[in-house]
């Protein structure tokens, strides 16, 4: 159990209110664009966005499943079910061919040889994430929309994302713990079931039940990369550390948090003060 208490109805209402205020102030936005992976974060973001666009007649929620090479059939099916149940417009765009050609050129230009090492898988995964964002941002520009981020607070603190590859224009979940992402998702599943919207409930439930993975072909699950067995453990370790408790400082979760600080500070820039100071 997470060591903090969460009121999921309050969080849900606050997301809709805050995001609605943002769209009200930015009336030039005509659509919301989201990449659907079949995972819980993009699924929950899509579900919330489907309710948000109802506040703005004519605004579209455009969903894309963008498999590349290593995505499983199960991931693709889950993404499709979310897209078909919640998006105004949904389709699948396989970018495997584009990725393979791009990566072949990158390898050739840098004179690298193909390998199956862990580091090589990370590099390939980074290129996949960045290629997806190239596609989504181009689509958003064409549709006069904005790309929705799907990251959560746990991923932020662990550096569990690709620089310039996973971040959109606006995020609902960035400061929710991963455990809370699951909790809010289950809250919404229960709401759909209470209204007998079974197809929507089943689509979201399938993402809750799935083994979490980045879908980039680096490992078979998030836990393999993080070094733990569940997200409740991860979140509680991080919560205690952020409160100043030091007993877990050598735990792989905290080591990863500390080592990924450069990501949370990206991009680094020389300050105005440092530029103009007289050092003579």
Regions found by a protein language model. Give the residues of each.
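Conserved G/P- and acidic residue-centered "switch" motifs that form tight phosphate/ATP-binding loops
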Residues: 39
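ATP/NTP-dependent adenylation/nucleotidyl-transfer catalytic domains that generate, transfer
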Residues: 1-34, 44, 48-51, 58-72, ...
């Amino acid at each position: 159990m997470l060591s903090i208490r969460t009121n999921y109805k309050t969080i849900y209402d606050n997301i809709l209110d805050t995001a609605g205020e943002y769209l009200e102030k930015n009336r030039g936005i005509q659509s919301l664009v989201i990449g659907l992976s079949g995972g819980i974060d993009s699924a929950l973001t899509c579900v919330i966005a489907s309710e948000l666009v109802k506040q703005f007649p004519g605004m579209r929620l455009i969903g894309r499943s963008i498999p590349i090479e290593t995505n499983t059939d199960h991931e693709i099916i889950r993404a499709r079910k979310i897209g078909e149940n919640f998006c105004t417009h949904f389709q699948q765009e396989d970018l495997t061919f584009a990725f393979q050609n791009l990566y072949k050129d990158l390898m050739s230009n840098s004179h690298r040889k193909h390998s199956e090492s862990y580091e090589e898988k990370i590099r390939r995964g980074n290129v996949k994430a960045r290629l997806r964002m190239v596609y989504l941002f181009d689509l958003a520009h064409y549709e006069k929309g904005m790309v929705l981020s799907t990251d959560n607070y746990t991923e932020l603190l662990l550096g569990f994302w690709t620089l310039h590859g996973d971040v959109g224009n606006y995020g609902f979940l960035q400061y929710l713990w991963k455990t809370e992402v699951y909790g809010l998702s289950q809250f919404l599943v229960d709401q759909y079931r209470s209204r007998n919207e079974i197809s929507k409930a089943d689509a979201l439930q399938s993402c809750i039940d799935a083994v979490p993975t980045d879908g980039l072909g680096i490992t078979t699950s998030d836990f393999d990369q993080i070094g733990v067995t569940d997200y409740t453990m991860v979140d509680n370790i991080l919560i205690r550390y952020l409160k100043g408790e030091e007993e877990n400082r050598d735990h792989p979760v905290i080591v990863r948090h500390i080592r990924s600080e450069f990501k949370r500070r990206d991009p680094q820039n020389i300050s105005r003060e440092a530029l103009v100071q007289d050092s003579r």
